[in-house]
Amino acid sequence: ALVVYIVFWIIIYKKEKIKWVWVSIHNIKKRFIENFQFFISSVAGHVSIHGGLIILANFVNNTILGEFALAQKIALLMRMVPIFFTQAILQKASILFENNKIEFNSYVNRIFIIGLSITFGMGLIAIILSKWIIFLLAGSYVIYSETILKILAFIPFLSMLNFNNMIKILVDEKKHLLARATWITAIIMLILATIGSYYYGGYGLSIALVLTEIVSFIVYSVLLIKNKHERA
């Protein structure tokens, strides 16, 4: 396998005529810092998404934990929709940001409205069909999972509220703001999740996750406004 891998890369290097170039220590250090900021942002994102379930495991039995996890998996899948929107327009948004700020704002706001409409509709459908969605996945009616899903159904919509902020951070390469915002959000989520899980179990954690999306929107907005004033 190693030999095949090496041969494969040799062929690519020769075919594409790739040349080795010495990179300065300064550039290596700069890229390392940038990538490290993305890395810690990703870690914070995983903490925000999966940390709650780990906390809940300390306060409920395995049956309740499994029923909660079933509903959360559906909500997490739905939460990918705002991420798909961000990835889909990022390249075009970056070009518009460099060349035409007015068109950039118009384009991003237009996609933002579309995203809000779609995620809101998804939330309504998930609430209305929650009983049958759980039955389809579990093979039986699980009232607890159904109720949890109804609470978590609007997480994609609330996550979409942060769409504009995320696009602005990414196109302007404000990696330090992204790292700070994700970790502030993660820490607040851990606090809310611990309190909610301790007093109300899965229901408390569900509400904590919903509140975390609202907190995330506020944190990103405040940091962007503060950064704008500092640069003015």
Cite the ranges covered by each PLM segment.
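Interfacial/gating helices of multi-pass transporter permease domains
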Residues: 27-34, 38, 55-75, 143-146, ...
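Interhelical loop/hinge segments that connect adjacent transmembrane helices in multipass membrane
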Residues: 6-49, 92-106, 227-232
